Design a protein with these regions (language model features):
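Hydrophobic transmembrane alpha-helices and their helix-loop junctions in integral membrane proteins
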Residues: 1-188
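A short, hydrophobic C-terminal helix/tail in secreted or cell-surface proteins
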Residues: 187-195
Length: 195
């Protein structure tokens, strides 16, 4: 009786946080929110919204429940880990074909959320540490990317990849910041020691 109630409550909270976190398959709101919101709002959303939900989920799992509980382990290994891997692969593939930079960065964020959830689903100290480090890195870096994109939009009135042609000459510092941000988000993933 009580155990089933606790498990149902846990599942409801995980689903609620998964919706706020934009965990696949509860991610539908994120690409549209990033694409159609003003860039300043998108910058704030990208830096904080999903990170707060992930942090709440982490605190909930490690403070309210014991991660040694068998049903918590089963839920995370059997449900969260496959969803994280699907998010990492599917969102990355979808992002490749996006010409709208806001949508591209939104799907990139979904893939990065997959990395964070994979670390959490390992239910280990190293997995948790890597999720937290990546959460902070992603928050700062994605905010910087959207700030750079906002500067590009002021100059070109456009958010498509083709509109970036020639901006390296007319906006060298912003273009440099954008390239560094992309490097920090995507190139450093496999080389980070915590993964």
């Amino acid at each position: 009786g009580d155990n089933r109630t606790i498990q149902a409550g846990f599942a409801f909270i995980v689903v609620g946080m998964g919706l706020k976190l934009a965990m696949i398959p509860l991610h539908v709101w994120l690409p549209n929110a990033y694409t159609y919101a003003p860039t300043v709002v998108t910058c704030f959303l990208a830096a904080t919204a999903t990170k707060v939900a992930l942090y709440v989920l982490i605190r909930f799992v490690f403070s309210v429940f014991s991660y040694e509980d068998s049903f918590v382990n089963e839920l995370f290994f059997l449900l969260l880990m496959p969803l994280a891997v699907v998010a990492m692969i599917a969102a990355s593939v979808i992002a490749i074909f996006k010409q709208n930079l806001k949508k591209l960065l939104a799907y990139s964020s979904l893939a990065q959320i997959g990395y964070m959830l994979l670390g959490l689903s390992l239910m280990s100290q190293k997995g948790l540490s890597s999720s937290l480090v990546h959460m902070v890195n992603h928050g700062f870096t994605k905010a910087a990317l959207f700030m750079s994109l906002g500067a590009f939009m002021l100059n070109t009135k456009n958010v498509y990849i083709k509109s970036l042609r020639g901006l390296g000459r007319s906006m060298p510092f912003t273009s440099g910041a954008f390239v560094i941000g992309l490097s920090l988000i995507h190139i450093s993933e496999p080389t980070r020691r915590s993964y």
